């Protein structure tokens, strides 16, 4: 087998074996009897062969040192490649996240464009929006009126009676170690409250306020001051006037916006 097809390690081992055999022959020839010694020509060839093997061993050792340096450089390059692979993987993850965010943004943008196109095809006048907003605010379905005070029958949401009948109103019982009333007890309390309100002619007034505020047949709201102290008439016209002013302001705004739209 040619030495060029062997690895550096195998070549070094083969050269060492050859040097060992040649050295053994020379030593045996040296200690052999005179009549058994080889001729001087053969001895000279063995010496030349040993010198050539020594040169070949030195050249192979130098080649092995060069290959060791190359292997060291390759190890460093492998580490750099590993680091670059980690950076590439990290960038790939960031790219996927950016792609997901971009896809989501594109989807949302298309939805907004679709909504804009629908709004352009089916426009709604500002007068209709103002009327709709006025209907919502006039019914006090979202919040109490700005001029609402204690005793005002314009309903703020939720009412006191509803809060007292709810779970939040019974939270003190749970804290003290008692069980909350069941649904039947709540329904019974609601029926009792409704019956009390119907019997006294007062609607949507808390139980705590039924003994304090009452409507008289004249249309005035009276507040009871205490046992035997009589009652005091409350003026609710300011609330009605304020509500009327709010309606007039809304009507004026709607008419002005309608005129501006028509222009």
Curated annotation (Swiss-Prot):
<dbReference type="Pfam" id="PF10018">
    <property type="entry name" value="Med4"/>
</dbReference>
<dbReference type="GO" id="GO:0070847">
    <property type="term" value="C:core mediator complex"/>
</dbReference>
<comment type="subunit">
    <text>Component of the Mediator complex.</text>
</comment>
<feature type="region of interest" description="Disordered">
    <location>
        <begin position="221"/>
        <end position="263"/>
    </location>
</feature>
<dbReference type="GO" id="GO:0003712">
    <property type="term" value="F:transcription coregulator activity"/>
</dbReference>
<comment type="function">
    <text>Component of the Mediator complex, a coactivator involved in the regulated transcription of nearly all RNA polymerase II-dependent genes. Mediator functions as a bridge to convey information from gene-specific regulatory proteins to the basal RNA polymerase II transcription machinery. Mediator is recruited to promoters by direct interactions with regulatory proteins and serves as a scaffold for the assembly of a functional preinitiation complex with RNA polymerase II and the general transcription factors.</text>
</comment>
<keyword id="KW-0010">Activator</keyword>
<dbReference type="GO" id="GO:0016592">
    <property type="term" value="C:mediator complex"/>
</dbReference>
<keyword id="KW-0175">Coiled coil</keyword>
<protein>
    <recommendedName>
        <fullName>Mediator of RNA polymerase II transcription subunit 4</fullName>
    </recommendedName>
</protein>
<keyword id="KW-0805">Transcription regulation</keyword>
<keyword id="KW-0804">Transcription</keyword>
<keyword id="KW-0539">Nucleus</keyword>
<feature type="compositionally biased region" description="Low complexity">
    <location>
        <begin position="251"/>
        <end position="263"/>
    </location>
</feature>
<comment type="similarity">
    <text>Belongs to the Mediator complex subunit 4 family.</text>
</comment>
<feature type="coiled-coil region">
    <location>
        <begin position="62"/>
        <end position="106"/>
    </location>
</feature>
<dbReference type="GO" id="GO:0006357">
    <property type="term" value="P:regulation of transcription by RNA polymerase II"/>
</dbReference>
<dbReference type="InterPro" id="IPR019258">
    <property type="entry name" value="Mediator_Med4"/>
</dbReference>
């Amino acid at each position: 087998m040619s030495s060029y097809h062997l690895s550096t390690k195998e070549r070094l081992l083969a050269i060492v074996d050859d040097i060992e055999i040649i050295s053994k022959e020379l030593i045996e020839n040296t200690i052999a009897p005179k009549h058994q010694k080889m001729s001087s020509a053969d001895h000279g060839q063995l010496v030349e062969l040993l010198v050539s093997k020594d040169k070949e061993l030195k050249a192979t050792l130098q080649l092995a040192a060069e290959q060791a340096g190359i292997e060291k450089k390759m190890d460093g390059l492998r580490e750099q490649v590993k680091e670059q692979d980690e950076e590439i993987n990290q960038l790939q993850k960031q790219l996927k996240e950016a792609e997901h965010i971009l896809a989501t943004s594109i989807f949302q943008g298309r939805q907004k464009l679709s909504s804009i196109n629908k709004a352009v095809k089916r426009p709604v006048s500002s007068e209709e929006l103002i009327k709709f907003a006025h209907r919502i605010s006039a019914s006090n379905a979202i919040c109490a009126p700005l001029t609402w005070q204690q005793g005002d029958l314009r309903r703020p949401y939720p009412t006191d009676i509803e809060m007292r009948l709810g779970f939040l109103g019974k939270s003190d019982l749970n804290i003290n170690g008692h069980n909350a009333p069941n649904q039947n007890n709540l329904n019974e309390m609601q029926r009792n409250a409704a019956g009390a309100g119907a019997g006294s002619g007062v609607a949507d007034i808390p139980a705590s306020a039924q003994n304090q505020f009452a409507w008289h047949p004249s249309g005035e709201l009276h507040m009871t001051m205490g046992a035997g102290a009589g009652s005091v008439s409350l003026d609710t016209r300011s609330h009605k006037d304020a509500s009327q002013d709010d309606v007039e302001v809304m009507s004026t705004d709607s008419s002005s916006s309608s005129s501006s739209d028509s222009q």
